[in-house]
């Protein structure tokens, strides 16, 4: 089972925000996640990002692969 760290879309039409989740790579975009890691709200200025660093490190140690967007959000959070 390959695990990915990726975004799932939440919110209303034209008012999206995203949860950052660990999910099986074969699961659909808004499918049931293995674990919630944080959230990303691009609708506010500046964009709001909250990521649980301990959970990210746990999943990366287990071999999870973040998507490009999630990788960039993690880097921003750490800086």
Curated annotation (Swiss-Prot):
InterPro entries tied to this protein: Ribosomal_bS16 (IPR000307), Ribosomal_bS16_dom_sf (IPR023803)
Any single GO BP term: translation
Domain of life: Bacteria
Signal sequence interval, chain numbering: none
Molecular functions (GO terms): structural constituent of ribosome
Keywords: Ribonucleoprotein, Ribosomal protein
Pfam families xref list: Ribosomal_S16
GO cellular component: cytoplasm; small ribosomal subunit
Keyword Ribonucleoprotein applies: yes
Family the entry assigns: Belongs to the bacterial ribosomal protein bS16 family.
Record NCBIfam families: S16 (TIGR00002)
Protein name: Small ribosomal subunit protein bS16
Organism of provenance: Nitratidesulfovibrio vulgaris (strain ATCC 29579 / DSM 644 / CCUG 34227 / NCIMB 8303 / VKM B-1760 / Hildenborough) (Desulfovibrio vulgaris)
Source organism phylogeny: Bacteria, Pseudomonadati, Thermodesulfobacteriota, Desulfovibrionia, Desulfovibrionales
Gene: rpsP
